[in-house]
Design a protein with these regions (language model features):
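NTP-dependent nucleotidyl-transfer catalytic core
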Residues: 1-193, 201, 208-213, 226, ...
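Conserved nucleotide- and phosphate/pyrophosphate-binding catalytic cores
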Residues: 204-405
Length: 405
């Protein structure tokens, strides 16, 4: 089975410009490809997983990844898939985030012996002459055509700034620049980037008379059509300081029954034949084993074998005894926040990140989905005495430790 065939079999491919040429290049290790990452936070998150795994797969097949950090475009803001204008960032914040990204990516990508490179488009975009851009690049783009793309149509009613309107031109110029300087002949990205990617291939064709290719990756959506990688606390980060290895493991251990096989195919390096065999007989205990395999595989990939072993052992200990709290996610509550040594259950649930609002916490309590120190809490007005270590159980699988500082 070729690399390209496996990508299709796993369901990784959404759209592409030329299937035969793309397959030929990546199957023979002749693709120098790039994927862009927006440095809008100081850590990668689950939303980046698809791109990271694709880069790793293609590099293992002899292809060369270029990681493009959008230090320049982050100062504009990408309207693709957005309904509001994004806050612009300072150069200092962007550089800090770039440094954090490089460190995390090294777990996925081999940067030795020039096997992969990291570039920042701020290095060329911030030095461009405006008149030159208008003459050399702007002349290659049709405003009429740009306005037909969904990313702009969605924003027209609420207001699209000229600043954001330039994003497609800047991203297209990135591809053109990488093609010239590094022989980059292919771009990969999320399906919401399709219009921007086509702009790059067209610019290369018009300016250089050469062919370049684009392929979009399937978006990581759950069975309800919502993007995966969110919890009550927010994003699921790849930084252990933001999302602990145990929390990361638990996120994947608790995916819905309908999503586990899809996640194994899209995100792990478990052989596709093994996954397909599991899919044919997936029920009962085998379903739990599939979820454990998913959680362990991804935790090992992101945090290493030792952290994955610890997370798995902690999860099993908690589920079997309900008492092992050593590796539980923990929230420290300042003593000053307590009244007579206690706190209302609804406030406590929100502060611990177990619920997004008091209303959600109230419904959960009323439905019998909350226990504190092995005692079910059914009164939304209950005051919980916090003394030493307090263990909250949400539903059947989520455990959380609260300590007072």
């Amino acid at each position: 089975m070729t690399v390209f065939e496996e990508l299709k079999r796993r369901g990784l491919i959404a759209q592409m410009t030329d299937e035969a040429e793309i397959a030929e290049l990546i199957n023979n290790g002749k693709a120098t490809f790039y994927i862009g990452f927006d440095p809008t936070a100081d850590s990668l998150h689950v939303g980046h997983f698809m791109a990271l795994c694709l880069m790793k797969r293609l590099q293992m097949a002899g292809n060369k990844p270029i990681i493009l950090i959008g230090g320049g475009t982050a100062m504009i803001g990408d309207p693709s898939g957005k309904t509001d204008m994004r806050k612009m960032m300072t150069k200092e914040t962007i550089q800090h985030n770039v440094d954090c990204f490089k460190k995390q990516m090294s777990r996925f990508i081999d940067f030795s012996e020039d096997k992969a490179i990291v570039v920042n488009n701020g290095d060329w975009l911030l030095n461009l002459n405006y008149i030159d851009v208008l003459r050399e690049v702007g002349a290659c783009f049709s405003v009429n055509r740009m306005l037909t793309h969904e990313c702009y149509k969605q924003r027209m009613e609420r207001g699209l700034t000229f600043l954001e309107f330039n994003y497609m031109i800047m991203q297209s110029y990135d591809f053109y620049k990488l093609f010239q300087d590094y022989g980059c002949n292919m771009q990969f990205g999320g399906d919401d980037q399709w219009a921007n990617m086509l702009g790059g291939t067209e610019l290369i064709r018009l300016k250089l008379g050469k062919d370049a290719y684009a392929m979009t990756i399937t978006l990581l959506l759950n069975s309800e059509g919502k993007k995966m990688g969110k919890t009550e606390k927010g994003a699921v980060w790849l930084d252990a300081e933001k999302t602990t290895p145990y929390e990361f493991y638990q996120y994947w251990r608790n995916v819905s029954d309908q999503d586990v096989i899809k996640c194994l195919k899209l995100l792990t390096f478990v052989p596709i034949e093994q996954i397909e065999e599991m899919e044919r007989t997936l029920e009962g205990q085998q379903l739990n084993q599939a979820k454990e395999l998913l959680a362990y595989s991804l935790t090992e990939l992101v945090h290493g074998k030792e952290a994955a072993d610890q997370a798995q052992d902690a999860a099993k200990a908690i589920f079997t005894s309900g008492s092992s709290s050593e590796n539980m996610p923990t929230t420290a509550i300042p003593a000053a926040d307590l009244q007579d040594g206690g706190m209302g259950i609804l406030t406590l649930m929100v502060k611990a990140g177990l619920c997004a609002s008091n209303g959600e916490a109230r419904r959960l309590v009323q439905q019998g989905g909350v226990s504190v120190n092995n005692e079910k809490v059914t009164d939304p007005k209950a005051i919980i005495t916090l003394d030493g270590e307090t263990i909250i159980k949400k539903g059947k699988k989520v455990f959380h430790k609260v300590v007072v500082e």
